[in-house]
Swiss-Prot record:
Name by which UniProt lists this protein: Small ribosomal subunit protein bS21
GO biological process: translation
Coiled-coil stretches noted in the UniProt entry, renumbered to this chain: none
A GO cellular-component term linked to this record: ribosome
Family note: Belongs to the bacterial ribosomal protein bS21 family.
Gene Ontology MF term list: structural constituent of ribosome
Amino acid sequence: MVTVIVQEGEPIEKVLKRFKARVEQEQILTELKRREYYEPPSERKKKRERNRRKKILKALKKQQQLI
């Protein structure tokens, strides 16, 4: 959990900037997005395979355009 201690007389903008930096440093938002929807391992595998095929097809199309 991220905690930021506010000093007396410190501008709120500075505190927010420090808070955002700590959240980013601890990768809280990326972890939250990753865990937002559970994806079973089988789905992850299928998704990786689809992306791999898409990438290969894209490379082939690009290569054929150059010829």
